[in-house]
Amino acid sequence: MSKGIPWQDGESLTLNNSTSTSLIVSLLVRYPELASVTFDPESKDLHLVFVLSQPLEKEAFEEFQRKTDLSLGIFFELSGHEQGKIDISYLNHEKNAFIEIRCDVQTLSQEEIALLHDLVVAEFGERLVSEQEDNLGEEELEVHEAIIENMLEDLKESSRPDKTLIGFREEGRVLVFNSNPWHNKN
């Protein structure tokens, strides 16, 4: 059940879309460096994919992974948040590299997503492929962060599985599709 999100003058912003759809859209709008976001209801995993404009060397990936593990360890220790499963992998394909971060939704927080995003941006900066969105104002950023936090909480509490959804950006638009390759009828 979606909660209202605090908005202007004590009003509440309520989202009518499915929880996972709202989460995917807000993540893609809030973090323009994200190429795609997938929610897998079976495993309750969120897959965050970033694209680099050139292939990634194994050593550079291992260094990024080491820094990320260290940063997350410090984050969990200082914040007191429960440390969940986070798997990071990469794939070189032609002239690009794809970095996938899989996170367990049951323990994931908005702050953790922000940290992961910031670590990717700090490490790969100009190499990240990003659709430059209009700069969101501080208030809009806060609204999307509140939506993300609320949708994560809703997914943690939900006992009904949603559909597997994938969202990505194309020509300035955010698109979300039902994606279940195991049940395609050919």
For each feature predicted by the language model, list its residue ranges.
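Alpha-helix boundary/N-cap detector
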Residues: 15, 19, 59, 63, ...
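Ordered hydrophobic segments in well-structured contexts
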Residues: 36, 47-49, 87-89, 96-104, ...
